[in-house]
From Swiss-Prot:
Protein name in the entry: Tyrosine 3-monooxygenase
Post-translational modification Phosphoserine, affected residues: S38
PANTHER family associated with the record: AROMATIC AMINO ACID HYDROXYLASE, TYROSINE 3-MONOOXYGENASE
Reactions the enzyme catalyzes: (6R)-L-erythro-5,6,7,8-tetrahydrobiopterin + L-tyrosine + O2 = (4aS,6R)-4a-hydroxy-L-erythro-5,6,7,8-tetrahydrobiopterin + L-dopa
A GO term, aspect molecular function: tyrosine 3-monooxygenase activity
Region span, Disordered: 1-29
Cofactor(s), by name: Fe(2+)
Pathway stated in the Swiss-Prot or TrEMBL entry: Catecholamine biosynthesis; dopamine biosynthesis; dopamine from L-tyrosine: step 1/2
Record-listed Fe cation binding positions: H321, H326, E366
Amino acid sequence: MPISNSSGSSTKSITRAGSELDRADSITSPRFVGRRQSLIEDARKEREAAAAAESSEASEQIVFDEEDGKALLNLFFTLRSSKIPALSRALKVFETFEAKIHHLETRTRRKPKDSLEDLEYFVRCEVHLADVSTLISSIRRIAEDVRTTKEVKFHWFPKKISELDSCHHLVTKFDPDLDQDHPGFTDPVYRQRRRMIGEIAFRYKHGEPIPRVEYTEEEIGTWREVYSTLRDLYTTHACSEHLEAFRLLERHCGYSPNSIPQLEDVSHFLKERTGFQLRPVAGLLSARDFLASLAFRVFQCTQYIRHASSPMHSPEPDCVHELLGHVPMLADRTFAQFSQNIGLASLGASEEDIEKLSTLYWFTVEFGLCKQGDGVKAYGAGLLSSYGELVHSLSDEPERREFDPEAAAAEPYQDQNYQSVYFVSESFTDAKEKLRVYAAGINRPFSVRFDPYTYSIEVLDNPLKIRGGLESVKDELKVLTDALNVLA
């Protein structure tokens, strides 16, 4: 539902922001939107391609895979629990046709018929190609809701942090060598500089120190203009978590108008604060690869800077956007966990869910607002790295709605101008809990768990693995219980 804009200090901030809109238009470059525009577009294209492939398969009515004259069949059917001999009769059918059963599982149907508890069976088996239709007909005589399906195949995802070396699929839409609308397209010196800095990311491997970049005077001048302009605005528009982290970054990581911080130094700072670390990237990653990195508490970060002719906006991610917008927020523990949870939810997800998660990321991590005190503040990196959009977001112009993951994931996003709709979170803790509920509804036959000791992903697809995870939780609870006893 819409958020009221009439609270005390919020009104002051909004009035101030409204009076600054004209100034914003006068000092900003043409309205390029920062960071995740292509994250959603890329996810959408992948989903449409997958849907087209599924449609093609459906039109051919392929319900099994064929290999060496054998059919690999995935078969679902339902047996009434009151029919005790039913299962033995069903298994007899598979035996008669010399079917080799690879997998058999049961589950209670969600909608039992006639008030009786039904059991649904899933059988993956191998049978002679010529016997498929006869086997299915035989099962239909003793079972209900008989159907076949293609095997559900889930996308590969990294299980170890070192496997992020394979997650480097770039989206080239905003490459200055290819995009004629890019501010650097007609500048051969800038394009050559971009290629040189991009090579650092292409060559980088996990575990290596991030190479340092010696920035030019022109690049530092661009940084200085953005840094000084935004820093003054943060005091009235940025959330308290961003302000606190920004002060620490100035104290410990060389944040200042006169120098561009090095990723290696910033990465060490983040790792000590929240366990997040940076990894150099040459441009916009595909949605799936970018989100997978977050699952390991790794943020893929660019080292190049926007073109000097467009200091206040960039059509793509750059170090201004990353260092001023994302890094301070990743220094907050609750927000860092929220970001990682989006990444964990993406692992093995369908193309449709990747698109929804990308859109959810857009309206939170990139363009999110939150309640603080009697007002509303910005926490999204797309806002905190863009003077014009930061002013716009807290003015009277846009609509503000209460954060709801389902609604945010389905909201059309604006990529040609400032957003017309922003979502406002009660708190990062509240947003994290809402995301947890949303992620639980994503259709995967497994859950995942991040192991912070080995920086790996554990796939929870059987009771033994879940029991092992619970043992770890029990150990941690014992430590906390003992601590309470000491204080009692």
